[in-house]
Amino acid sequence: MSDFYGPQHWETLYREGRMPWDAGGVPAELAAYLTRQPNAGRALVPGCGSGYEAAALADAGFDALAIDFSAAAVARAREITADSRARVEQLDFFELGDDDFGLVYERAFLCALPPARREDWAHACARLLPAGGRLAGYFFLGPTNADGPPFAIPPDELKALLDDAFERLEDRPVEAPLPVFGETERWQVWQRRDDT
């Protein structure tokens, strides 16, 4: 795999302060979700970046684990989450064991992956979430572009990736999409089916 997708690429972006995926806080849809979603136990934030969302999840009562394979992202997230109970670890999402999480939170992780890893991502989400567990967050929808990351994903492809193991519960426009994603960013919640 090209280092363009490896830790060194992301280290450089963090060192140079080029983080167009960083919302600088907790997005409105996640904040609203946390007010109406009962504590589902453990929450995972893959590709956690600065970690704002991990702190919000911990503050809402989740046992939040934020992971990133970039040491610079982990250092930044540890600073931002220092006053919360969130744990931040330098780990590769695809190397996680068979832990069960009640929630996997998505923002700017799937679109940072090479499109060839999308199926691996979907299988990992299904493996990490038991029946009733939820995959919730923001998805950059649109035709797959060759000049990413970020890589948009066609809505039909996302549905095909997740439909066997998940049922979509929510799908709506984002109140304040990140400029890098524009109006194609959607808030979605998917619940793990019990029959797969």
Label every PLM stretch briefly.
Residues 1-45, 49-99, 115-196:
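Class I (Rossmann-like) S-adenosyl-L-methionine-dependent methyltransferase catalytic domain
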Residues 108, 112:
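Short catalytic micro-motifs in class I SAM-dependent methyltransferases
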Residues 105:
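A conserved beta-strand element that flanks and buttresses the S-adenosyl-L-methionine
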